[in-house]
Structures are given as C-alpha cells and as structure tokens.
C-alpha cells in the first residue's frame, strides 16, 4: 500500500505542473527518480517548392536516473531519403538540474543539458538540428519559472554539426557548422479549474518561440509554435501543435507543419 501511495504522489507531483511540460523544448524540471517513460514524436512538415510531406518519427526512452539527473535515448526515422520509413540514426540526451527554489504552487529551476547525435541522412539544409537531421552535439542551460497555473521557460544552447554518416558531408563549410539556439516558452493550465483527483484530465495551452543564429554566416530563423496538450490520469499525455516559420535567412527544406507527441510514464520502476 505504501508503494502504491508513493507512486500516486509521484504522478501528482509530476503532472500537476504539466503546463511546463513543453513540446519543442525541455523544462528545467526533471522526471521523478526511478521513473521510465516511453515517448513517440511525430513531425509532419511541408517541403518547400514541393507537394512532398516530410515525416519524421522519433521514439524515445526516458529515465529518471536520480533526483537531479534524467537521461533520454532516441531513434531517428524518416521518409525523406526514401519513399518509405527508414532508420537514420539516434541520440543520447542528459539533463542535470543544479538549482531549485521551490514554494507552494511556484518554483524557479535551472538545469544544464547536452545532446550527442548521430545521423546517416543527407544534409539538405543550413539549419543545424540535432533532433533528427545532423550528427554532432548541443549543450546549454534552461531556466523555468512556475507561478500557479502559468509556466515560463527559456533555453540557450550552442550546437556543433559534423559530417553525417554514409559519406554525407556537411556541405556548408566548417565556418558555418556552429549555431546558437535560444527559445522562450509559455504554458497555461486551462482545465481543471480545481483539482479533486489525480485522474482528472489536464488541458494546457502553450506557445513556444524558437530561434537559431549561425555563428559563421550570421543567418537566422525564428519560429512560433502553438500547442494544445492533454494529460490523462497523471500518467500519459498527447500534444498536438503547429510549427510555423516567422522569418528566416537560413535555407530550410521544411519550415512549417504539424507535430504530435504521445507519452506514457511508469513510476517507481527502480
């Protein structure tokens, strides 16, 4: 009975602040220690100057390794280089929370994160993206502020691209292989108005802005992404959003489209 109660409390503590569980960026908060989640990300993006749709499927296994550390393992699949879904690579992501200033219905947290990615697909755009496109690394910090039903989060990171596998060279030159990424995300809990059970469905609305500046060329892009999120039984979630380019001087092959995330969490696994 005690283990069941602990699992329920973990679920409530994780998803009662679901308005900070953003879709395109990670908050500074971590998964509960001992938890494991299975996540599937789907991107359905319109290719420029074409009727083709770029579909990327990225399944992830995420582990709450400790109170401060979480680790994620992802695989990259897409239809871009073939007419069927093809495995193209994978990544390892880690996040370490180094600051927590918590109070009732509010907190401020900061974390450092890093990603190492390997990809075998052709390099087809100037944008540097470690989540399904480039081989390389990304490292940065994230700060998240929760104030009752509203969450604000911001990230700052640097990304470095290398040649992709399969003899797919980074064709834009060594000088243009680094970029600075930054983002600002806003989330608000819409329903329920009052909590009476951890089984209540949560509905959150979010808006995320994402920007990249290439340190060599100075070229940039700015995107905006509205998202609606559903949390079920404090254990699973579905996010549906639309990402749209606001401005860009970088070559990008698919700058707008829909994304869908499905995730299920297991608490107190180890």
Residue ranges of model-derived segments:
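Transmembrane beta-barrel domains of Gram-negative outer membranes and organellar outer membranes
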Residues: 18-154, 158-163, 173-270
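Sec-dependent N-terminal signal peptides
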Residues: 4-13
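Extended low-complexity, intrinsically disordered segments associated with secretion/export
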Residues: 168-170
């Amino acid at each position: 009975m005690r283990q069941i109660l602990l699992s329920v409390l973990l679920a409530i503590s994780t998803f009662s602040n679901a308005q900070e569980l953003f879709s395109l960026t990670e908050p500074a908060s971590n998964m509960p220690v001992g938890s494991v989640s299975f996540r599937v990300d789907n991107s359905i993006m319109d290719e420029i100057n074409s009727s083709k749709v770029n579909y990327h499927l990225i399944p992830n296994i995420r582990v709450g390794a400790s109170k401060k550390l979480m680790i994620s393992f992802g695989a990259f699949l897409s239809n871009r280089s073939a007419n069927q879904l093809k495995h193209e690579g994978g990544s390892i992501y880690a996040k370490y929370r180094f600051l927590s200033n918590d109070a009732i219905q509010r907190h401020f947290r900061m974390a450092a994160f890093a990603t190492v990615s390997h990809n075998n697909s052709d390099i087809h755009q100037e944008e540097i993206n470690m989540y399904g496109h480039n081989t390389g690394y990304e490292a940065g910090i994230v700060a998240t502020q929760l104030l009752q039903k509203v969450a604000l989060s911001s990230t700052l990171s640097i990304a470095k691209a290398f040649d992709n596998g399969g003899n797919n060279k980074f064709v834009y030159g060594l000088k243009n292989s680094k970029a600075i990424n930054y983002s600002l995300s806003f989330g608000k809990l819409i329903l329920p108005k009052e909590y009476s059970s951890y089984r209540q469905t949560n509905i959150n609305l979010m808006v995320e802005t994402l920007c990249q500046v290439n340190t060599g060329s100075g070229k940039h892009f700015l995107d905006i992404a509205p998202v609606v999120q559903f949390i079920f039984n404090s254990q699973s979630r579905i996010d549906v959003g639309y990402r749209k380019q606001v401005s860009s001087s970088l070559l990008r092959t698919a700058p707008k489209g829909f994304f869908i995330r499905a995730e299920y969490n297991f608490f107190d696994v180890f």
